[in-house]
Curated annotation (Swiss-Prot):
Pfam families assigned: Pectinesterase (PF01095)
Major localisation: secreted
The protein's role, per its UniProt record: Involved in maceration and soft-rotting of plant tissue.
Any Gene Ontology biological process: cell wall modification
Subcellular location, record wording: Secreted
Family named by the database record: Belongs to the pectinesterase family.
Record's protein name: Pectinesterase
GO cellular component: cell outer membrane; extracellular region
Disulfide bonds, paired cysteine numbers: none
EC number: 3.1.1.11
Residue numbers marked as site, Transition state stabilizer: 231
Species whose genome carries this gene: Ralstonia solanacearum (Pseudomonas solanacearum)
Pathway participation: Glycan metabolism; pectin degradation; 2-dehydro-3-deoxy-D-gluconate from pectin: step 1/5
Gene behind the chain: pme
Signal peptide boundaries: 1-26
Amino acid sequence: MQSTTLYLKTAAFLGGCSLFAATALAATSTATRPQLSNADARAYTIASYMASFGTIGSLTTDNWDPTGGVGAVSGFRANYAVAADGSAQYKTVQAAIDAAVADGGVARKYISVKAGTYNELVCVPESAPPITLYSLDANANNTVIVYNNANPTPASGAKTNPCMGTSSNATVGTVRSATAMVRASNFNARNLTFKNSYVEGTFADNNQSAVALAVRGDKAILENVSVIGNQDTLYLGATNNTMVIRAYFKNSFIQGDTDFIFGAGTAVFHGCTIQYTAARLGARATSYVFAPSTAPDNPHGFLAINSTFNATGNASNNSTHLGRAWDQGVSGTSAYINGSSPNGQVVIRDSSLGAHIRLADPWGPSTAGRPYCSSKCAYSANRFFEYNNTGAGSGN
């Protein structure tokens, strides 16, 4: 991509969503920080990311539009009610989900969750009808689903997410560590926090991943939710890597410190706060926000739009990468196959980037060791782009 400097004045409609009018001096497109042109940016919208699903190579287009969000909870009528204090029909979230699955049908089931802390593992199985899980309390921090599990947790005697079944592995593993997992399609959530409370270092291992939420079913909408962890906080990907699933996060909060939004799924983060925390790794640590493992034939991985990237825990300026490619299943560069191995895809546009973001090189080498490269590359060119971003970390 040639180096260009553009003056932008836009008031665009992307996927039916009105963006704020802005006047901005666009960052110069460089080999290490490629910027989309005005023309190219038209291909990377909410509508384009959410348009298709199914088998990679033969995707089905249904032009799904999730931008209306979950809806106002005041208009919901709960089919099932949960309260940790015992004041409702069910004391656990999982018990209510199990009841909804047992009742079956195709109509959407509404599960209200009273403000409180729910220390449990949650599974929404593939067999579940459409479910809306919500709290009437608009502060997502007041209704928390939390569990303590991690990749290195010894499997013997430990509970793992019930969506995953049994395993002969010695440790729980990354995906099995999820506090909440959604395998059904058409899942909605609002006003909730999903958290993994694992304290890194409790069990020795180089991989300290601990998932708070795993979305594995298609057409998930999550609005005003918080997803909190450290390494590998939010996982997005189908149970079969030949399939594409879609998730839409609206006005939500995601926090972590290493590869904390990862997977092969297609997801949009619209009006979200994506927060890097330096509390565990230290102020000067170098880390990564996104770690997509997008299939090479899938043009859409992760899109962050109208969002805010900030930091907490005294993170140093110019310390955090926006992301790196997760070359899932690839042990090293000698095993990487161009056009066949995963090649993560991310676009960050119309967003505010904090001073913690690295200016000259916001995209790091892949997990298999591929050096970041945007053109004329020995390996597949990275698919990471920006457009019309602002803030100290944007390069503007």
